[in-house]
A protein has these predicted regions:
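Hydrophobic helical h-region of N-terminal Sec-dependent signal peptides
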Residues: 9-13
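Acidic, polar-rich low-complexity tracts and alpha-helical solenoid repeat scaffolds
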Residues: 2-8, 19-185
Length: 185
């Protein structure tokens, strides 16, 4: 009789414990089943808030933002927010003087998102990074020319033409030309 009683008590204890574990496991699984995209968007919103709360760029926070944008654009390349995050990445990379990366972000926009709302600006910024920071005059000329040909009515066309005319010129040459145009002043 003691054996049966012990067996029944043990069985009830095991059943009660297993029911509790299922509920605990279920709650744990529910907590783990968070949409990764939503989690990433929440993280991006948080880091953007942190960046905008300071008048100066913090390189560590900027690096964190670039990492989050990279994760998003890599995992969701067809999402409508992806070109925005690439553009923001280009701006941040330029601000923290990571010019090759900035160029790459703008180039990716131009190649993969031709209907993006800031496509003209992306071409111009891509060329500007090549021109002003990477000293790649011929590549810059090519991108400026693409901008002019693809978007002849763009507000960036005149700036692109002026930049092409100034490619390869030293600061002294540019100053002399400016003074000459303004009557030697």
């Amino acid at each position: 009789m003691k054996k049966i009683h012990f067996f029944v008590v043990t069985l009830i204890t095991v059943l009660a414990a297993s029911c509790g574990n299922d509920e605990a496991t279920s709650k744990l699984e529910d907590a783990k089943i968070v949409d990764p995209k939503s989690h990433l968007l929440t993280s991006i919103a948080g880091i953007e808030k942190k960046m905008h709360s300071s008048p100066q760029i913090d390189n560590i926070v900027a690096g964190q933002a670039l990492q989050l944008y990279y994760e998003y654009t890599t995992n969701y390349p067809t999402d409508p927010a992806t070109p925005d995050y690439l553009f923001k990445s280009g701006e941040i990379a330029t601000a923290i003087q990571q010019y090759p990366q900035a160029y790459s972000y703008y180039k990716t926009i131009c190649e993969k998102y031709p209907t993006y709302k800031l496509i003209e600006e992306s071409y111009f910024l891509q060329a500007s990074v090549l021109d002003n920071y990477l000293n790649e005059d011929e590549k810059a000329r090519k991108v400026y020319t693409q901008l002019i040909n693809l978007f002849p009515k763009s507000t960036y066309v005149n700036d692109a033409k002026a930049a092409i005319n100034n490619l390869g010129k030293s600061d002294e040459e540019l100053i002399k030309e400016f003074q000459k145009k303004n009557g030697g002043k």
